[in-house]
């Protein structure tokens, strides 16, 4: 018989250093930490095998298919500078292994069982190259950056948001009031907190109604288009869709979803509904740190960001950069570009392992949120540029005079930074000066500067 039973080394079948990658292959870069005594080639081949066609022993049914056509291949291994026990294994997967238009299926294969594999101490997926042939099977973001600007009629500046706090405990009426005050003061958006779904103190339908009222009142008074991210995340897909449908019936511009806790299947369904019905979709990344925080195990956020662009979302939270380490800044800007741009070159200094061509799939606006305030505005404007959403929760609601003045302070600071930049000034060097000048004309901004002045910002 042509079948030899028994266990054999993975590297005999799955380590192929001479392999020329195809344009249609999905390429993955894994950071592998093998158990002591397991050679890199064997560990890399094991990853390729376990995340594609392999199993632990030779099986009779292997003879019924063409392994050459379907197997994953570890085609390159490189050491990691400064880490004795780690290396990067590059794996190529044939396109046929994956269902079209399913992020869920892609992840089930690539980051499925293999992460519990005994021969490895740890495994981290650092980056994925999605071939254009696979990209084209996804609808992607419901609308994208340009369409959003046109819908909102806001150009040439970042958009401003604010998460309504306290995140849990407000009644719907008081919640709506906070929304109105922020929008009236000058913000473009307010946001449901990611944990706000439909709890006993505020059921979703009541919240939607009072927020819609707040939006329309603020729009009428300011002459600007306003939005509130109504969180449609729910315990079942049916309930999630019910909430999205009600939002559409109210005529509001945008809804929101927690894509990791809600799951990619639910998210993609919601994204399709949003495109069909003209709703923008704001994505929150609750649970991402469970997956991406460990340096040697899990998945890097850039992979989750790519997956979201494929599954669909118009905004996604992407960290703030400010006050963090310099290296962190380059890495963050790397995946921010992966979200926004049509074509991104391989650049290891920014953590980008592969050149990615999105073939005109719409882009996603990165959202900077978490612990930022008016003194950060120049840096945020410089780092993120116009195509971003800057969200100040406490930085708006924590204003000593209240929500509306807090919103005014942020809007004045933003407009001052944008104007200064357009006049050719260096925001990195003159940032504090620009904010100080602007605060002479805005008592609201002056008060905000005073409250947060001791929180130093090292650029």
Curated annotation (Swiss-Prot):
Q: Which residues cross the membrane?
A: none
| Enzyme Commission designation | 4.1.1.39
- Which Gene Ontology CC terms are recorded? chloroplast
Does the keyword section mention Transcription regulation?
Answer: no
Binding site residues for Mg(2+):
191, 193-194
The site (Transition state stabilizer) lies at 324
Molecular functions per Gene Ontology: magnesium ion binding; monooxygenase activity; ribulose-bisphosphate carboxylase activity
Residues annotated as carrying N6-carboxylysine in the record are 191
Q: Which InterPro entries match?
A: RuBisCO, RuBisCo_large_chain_AS, RuBisCO_lsu_C, RuBisCO_lsu_C_sf, RuBisCO_lsu_fd_N, RuBisCO_lsu_N_sf, RuBisCO_lsuI
The kind of enzyme this is, by top-level EC class, is: lyase
Name the domain of life: Eukaryota
In this chain, substrate is annotated as bound at 113, 163, 167, 285, 317, 369
Keywords assigned: Calvin cycle, Carbon dioxide fixation, Chloroplast, Disulfide bond, Lyase, Magnesium, Metal-binding, Methylation, Monooxygenase, Oxidoreductase, Photorespiration, Photosynthesis, Plastid
- Record text on cofactor binding: Binds 1 Mg(2+) ion per subunit.
Required co-factor(s) are: Mg(2+)
Q: Provide the function of this protein.
A: RuBisCO catalyzes two reactions: the carboxylation of D-ribulose 1,5-bisphosphate, the primary event in carbon dioxide fixation, as well as the oxidative fragmentation of the pentose substrate in the photorespiration process. Both reactions occur simultaneously and in competition at the same active site.
PANTHER family linked to this entry: RIBULOSE BISPHOSPHATE CARBOXYLASE, RIBULOSE BISPHOSPHATE CARBOXYLASE LARGE CHAIN
Return the similarity comment.
Belongs to the RuBisCO large chain family. Type I subfamily.
Q: How does this protein assemble?
A: Heterohexadecamer of 8 large chains and 8 small chains; disulfide-linked. The disulfide link is formed within the large subunit homodimers.
Stated name of the protein:
Ribulose bisphosphate carboxylase large chain
Q: Which organism is it from?
A: Morus alba (White mulberry)
């Amino acid at each position: 018989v042509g079948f030899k039973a028994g266990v054999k080394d993975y590297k005999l079948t799955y380590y192929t250093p001479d392999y020329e990658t195809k344009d249609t292959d999905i390429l993955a870069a894994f950071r592998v930490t093998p158990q002591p005594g397991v050679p890199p080639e064997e560990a890399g081949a094991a990853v390729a095998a376990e995340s594609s066609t392999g199993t632990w022993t030779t099986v009779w049914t292997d003879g019924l298919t063409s392994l050459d056509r379907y197997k994953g291949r570890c085609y390159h291994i490189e050491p990691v500078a400064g880490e004795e026990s780690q290396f990067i294994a590059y794996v190529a997967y044939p396109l046929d292994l994956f269902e079209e238009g399913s992020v869920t299926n892609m992840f089930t294969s690539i980051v499925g069982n293999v992460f519990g594999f005994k021969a490895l101490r740890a495994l981290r997926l650092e980056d994925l190259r999605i071939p254009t042939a696979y990209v084209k099977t996804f609808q992607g973001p419901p609308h994208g950056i340009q369409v959003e600007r046109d819908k909102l009629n806001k150009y040439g500046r970042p958009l401003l948001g604010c998460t309504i706090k306290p995140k849990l405990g407000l009644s719907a009426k008081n919640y709506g009031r906070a929304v109105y005050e922020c929008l009236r003061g000058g913000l473009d958006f307010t946001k449901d907190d990611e944990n706000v779904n439909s709890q006993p103190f505020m059921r979703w339908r009541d919240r939607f109604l009072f927020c819609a009222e707040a939006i329309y009142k603020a729009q009428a008074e300011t002459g600007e288009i306003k939005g509130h991210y109504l969180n449609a995340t729910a315990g079942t897909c049916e309930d999630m869709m019910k909430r999205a449908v009600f939002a559409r019936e109210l005529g509001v511009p945008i809804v929101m979803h927690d894509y990791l806790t809600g799951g990619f299947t639910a998210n993609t369904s919601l994204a399709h509904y949003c495109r069909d019905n003209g709703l923008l979709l704001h994505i929150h990344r609750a649970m991402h740190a469970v997956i991406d925080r460990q340096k040697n195990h899990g998945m890097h956020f850039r992979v989750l960001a790519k997956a979201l662009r494929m599954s669909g979302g118009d905004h996604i939270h992407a960290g703030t950069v400010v006050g963090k380490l310099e290296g962190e800044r380059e890495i963050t800007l790397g995946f921010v570009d992966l979200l926004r741009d049509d074509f991104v070159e391989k650049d290891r200094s920014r953590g980008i392992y592969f050149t990615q061509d999105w073939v005109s799939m719409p882009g996603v606006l990165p959202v900077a949120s978490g612990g930022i305030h008016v003194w950060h505005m120049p840096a945020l404007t410089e780092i993120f540029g116009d195509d971003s959403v800057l969200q100040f929760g406490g930085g708006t609601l924590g204003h000593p005079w209240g929500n509306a003045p807090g919103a005014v302070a942020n809007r004045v600071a933003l407009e001052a930074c944008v104007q200064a930049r357009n006049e050719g000034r260096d925001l990195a060097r003159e940032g504090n000066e620009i904010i100080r000048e602007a605060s002479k004309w805005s008592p609201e901004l002056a008060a905000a500067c005073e409250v947060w002045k001791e929180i130093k910002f090292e650029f």
